[in-house]
Amino acid sequence: MLFEHLEHRLAACERHKNYGALLLLDLDGFKEINDTRGHDVGDLLLQTIAQRLEQSRRQEDIAGRLGGDEFIVLAQQLASNQELAEEKAFRIARKLQESLIEPIIYDGIKLQIGCSIGIRLMEPQRISTAQAIREADIAMYRAKRNRNNGVQIFTPTQPVPSADSIPIQARAMSGL
């Protein structure tokens, strides 16, 4: 269902000749919490993150869990020019990040995670949902490689990383 919504919203960007953005969020430090505190705590953390994401997204945007500790937000109707759309997408990413990295208290334990975000600006010309996710994923891994809690916007001139430089989880999801 998430992918159907994404397809519909991406088509709307093309119809309205307006830029949107696909944001791919990956939690920094989730695996460690899940491994050390257990899957129940990890599941609670994912539920809390999903709630925070839902509360902090703009009303016109859609959000969903892609899988594991990755989430997607599709921000639409950002602007009619690329520069302004990039600025707005970056501000949206930072706002989401601020809400997600707030500590979570569970049974007296303070859980702290980070969030790296890759952004694929959606031009008024249509690209496939799979390509948009793949390119947002590339930007997200660049953000993660530069530093935790990073935000990176994909640009088509960026070289695509080799399959060896992408973690096994991501390769499995993208079919590499």
Task: Name each region found by the language model.
Residues 63, 91, 95-99, 105, ...:
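Cyclic nucleotide signaling catalytic output domains
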Residues 58:
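Short conserved AdoMet
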Residues 27, 77, 117:
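Residues immediately flanking
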Residues 35, 75-79, 101, 122-123:
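Residue-level recognition of strand-loop junctions within catalytic nucleotide-signaling folds
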